[in-house]
Regions:
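Eukaryotic tandem repeat interaction scaffolds
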Residues: 160, 165, 169-233
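Solenoidal tandem-repeat scaffolds enriched in leucines and small polar residues
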Residues: 129-139, 150-158, 173-178
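Short "repeat-start/strand-capping" segments in structured domains, especially the N-termini
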Residues: 60, 81-82, 103-104, 125-126, ...
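Ankyrin-repeat and related helical/solenoid repeat scaffolds used for protein-protein interactions
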Residues: 214-271
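N-terminal capping/linker segments that flank leucine-rich repeat
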Residues: 1-109, 120, 124-125, 131, ...
Length: 290
């Protein structure tokens, strides 16, 4: 490390342009690097190898956003032991070994990114929020040890089952939109969940989610559901999406006291639902999209 106000000779000062405040480019010295900057937020678009290597001089960085195109080597990030929030998008990554043993990362957001090996995610047991959007995922075995997760976003992948989630008892928010899932049975014991986005899957049976008494938001649009009788037991539901399914009878929703919004676009309901139940729901002040 250089002394005084001299930065390390291999420090890429273009990083300064990426700090969170767009109206102020900070003057960085070696003293400042050594002493803190505990709330550093860096956003890099198509980072160069020099920029990534320079991040090792910012050990107190807490939040990092990388927007990339093409291959990227993230090994230089292994020294960022205080990193709490990491976002990566549009990259090709061989692995995420740099996170192995990290005890600080609480929020990880990886989207539109190809990763050859996800196994090191299993060591991030302190994670509270995980987003893996459009990452070509077809296996969740690595995720079963992340028991403290509260928010999980897995949309636009190739998942067929959710078995790996069946012991994630802290989970409150789950987004599995745009997969190939046909069974929600693995969620039956996750009674803390209050928000599920499960549109664009192959779900036909919703009986397995009746134990989820805290559900306030449920989106099942673009599935194969025909019977919504089980939903009548989810008395905390406020928002429900059942658009583009095979539902004929909407009457089970009459018993939901907190319901405020229903999306039924593309469904062909029977005469009784069209003439009686839907008007009655609207009369209660419920917004219905049809």
């Amino acid at each position: 490390m250089a002394n005084g106000n001299e930065l390390p000779p291999d420090f890429d000062q273009s990083i300064l342009e990426s700090f969170a405040n767009p109206n102020s480019t900070p003057t960085l010295s070696s003293n400042m690097i050594e002493e803190g900057l505990s709330s550093i937020v860096v956003s890099l678009i198509d980072p160069t190898a020099t920029q990534l290597n320079s991040l090792k001089y910012l050990p107190n960085m807490e939040k990092l956003t990388l927007k990339c195109t093409g291959d990227i080597d993230l090994d230089p990030l292994e020294n960022l032991s205080n990193l709490r929030h990491l976002q990566i998008s549009n990259a090709n990554i061989e692995n995420i070994d740099f996170l192995d043993g990290n005890q600080c990362v609480a929020s990880l957001d990886i989207s539109d990114t190809s990763i050859a090996n996800f196994s090191k995610l299993a060591t991030l047991r302190q994670l509270k929020s995980l987003r893996l959007k459009n990452c070509d995922l077809d296996d969740l075995s690595f995720i079963s040890s992340l028991n403290d997760l509260e928010t999980l976003n897995l949309n636009d992948n190739n998942l067929e089952n959710l078995t790996a989630l069946n012991h994630m008892f802290s989970l409150k928010v789950l987004d599995i939109d745009g997969n190939d899932i046909f069974d929600l049975g693995a969620l039956a014991s996750l009674t803390q969940i209050n928000w599920i986005h499960a549109a664009r899957n192959n779900i036909s049976d919703v009986s397995s989610i009746t134990p989820l008494k805290n559900l306030a938001f449920l989106n099942l649009s673009h599935n194969e559901v025909s019977n919504i009788d089980p939903l009548s037991k989810l008395t905390k539901l406020q928002w429900i999406g059942i658009a583009f399914n095979r539902i004929r009878d909407i009457s089970p929703l009459n018993s939901l006291p907190k319901l405020r919004y229903i999306d039924i676009e593309g469904d062909s309901f029977n005469h009784q639902s069209t003439r009686t139940h839907i008007p009655n729901l609207r009369a209660r002040g419920i917004e219905i999209i049809s």
